Amino acid sequence: MKFSQWYTLTAPLLISSLYTVNAANDLRGVASDKSDLYKPDAKGNWKCLGSDKLISFNQVNDDYCDCPDGSDEPGTSACHNGKFFCKNTGYISSYIPSNRVDDTVCDCCDGSDESLIKCPNTCAQKAREYLATLEEHNRLVKNGLKIREQWALESAKKTDEVKARYKEISDSLVAVSAEKTQLSEKVEKMKRSTDLGAEAVLPLDFQDLRVALLSLVDERNEMQERLDILTNLLDELTLLYETDKFDETMKEAILSFEDLKEQEIRRKVSSDDVHNYLESCNNHLSMLTGPSEDITFSSLIKDIKKILNSLVWNIKLSLINFGILSPSASSTPLTDSESYRRFEAAQRDLDAAEENEKSLEKEHTKLMHELEYHHGWDLYRAIKGMETKREIGGYTYKVVFYENVFQDSILLGNFASQEGNVLKYENGQSCWNGPHRSAIVTVECGVENEIVSVLEAQKCEYLIKMKSPAACSPDQLKQSLLNTQNSANENAVNGMEDKESSVDEL
């Protein structure tokens, strides 16, 4: 008789006799801490675990599914939704689907799922492999944590330096603002001084006005140049549309546009500055032309002469600035007086104080934003700017923490936000007939910065996996789940699915 024929005839009898023996002791397929759930009542009946259905206790493990939840057949394959408990002494207790019970395939390492064939006990071997994998995993996490701790210390030190610099700038800003106020009052007082005279400061008023107007003209000319460049780029793209060179030209045009955007714009002068200079000129002209009891024809001629001398001095100064005259040609009688020299020195001090204040305000604002921004990692300042490169699929990918991501020379995105160990980079270069490129970088614990994989999940949207000590956490250290006692402990697992995934993750 063939084995298959013998198995078909004898299996029901053997299984039935086995289940009868187990009925008197622990039920097959039931964890020891669940055995109390499988006790008959005084009448020999038993209630299904997942419903109110009452059956005879003799129907438990009789190879026929009576309960809707399959709880009456923990040790057979009768119920499609049942589950069998593998004790796996020396390894990790687990559950398997009950349709794998007595299918002549050994699923439990202790072989308890197969009653008709002899399964080798592989629990000890699996335990050794598991412990080796667990030890290696924890070693990597610990090494990554050591590096991360160093980065965190560096970041904390840099944060303290930023805070100290912020306080220093704040104190300096207060002092410079007070100094500027004093100098401004001093200069205004000197302008109104009879020793200096309005005719002496009027050229300075005109000089300020001239500089402001020239700055506005320069700004207008620069903007016109930028407009002309952009217009030419668009004209070239229009002419090359639907040609073989369009993609290449498009790339060059975009790079040119990026370079153009990065060029520094000259200092802007607002219309308020021009208005203030005009008002100052008007005030000092009023001082010259206002009614006076002492005005005579002779004094009027002298005043006109002084004004003309001032205008000539202003013109000479302009010619010197343009490199037409030498500085020696700028001397005029107005600069000979001690009062004027003191005024000129005070004006220089005021200009220097104003420039210093603007510089301090700019740095103060930058530091304030830096301190107010909350980053996802406490080691932000230590790793900002760190580059990680790898060639994948013929492209060189570069990830710069908290800055940008590149595919060769193509910008995939600038850093936008962080959620946990996921960094988002957005507003990269535009795809042809598509959106702006973007990248999501998911970082896992590792002993060094490494790009693991790159996937273009959707058009121009890239998913990048990395390893880095930055993503290591003490929570990632795993404890052994081995069942070291000779008793099934279901508390060692949180269900069949959780257990299998926990082991696989190692």
Swiss-Prot record:
| A cellular-component GO term for this protein | glucosidase II complex
What range(s) does the MRH domain occupy? 279-474
> Does the entry annotate any disulfide bonds, and if so which pairs?
86-108, 431-460, 445-472
Q: Where is this gene product found?
A: Endoplasmic reticulum
The membrane-spanning stretches of this chain are none
Q: Which Pfam families does UniProt cross-reference here? A: PRKCSH-like, PRKCSH_1
Which parts of the chain are coiled coil?
A: 172-243, 338-374
Question: Known consequence of changing residue 456 to Q?
Answer: Impairs N-glycan recognition
Q: Which PROSITE patterns match?
A: MRH
Keyword tRNA processing in record: no
How it assembles, according to the record, is:
Heterodimer of a catalytic subunit alpha (gls2) and a subunit beta (gtb1).
What name does the UniProt record give this protein? Glucosidase 2 subunit beta
Q: From what organism does this protein derive? A: Schizosaccharomyces pombe (strain 972 / ATCC 24843) (Fission yeast)
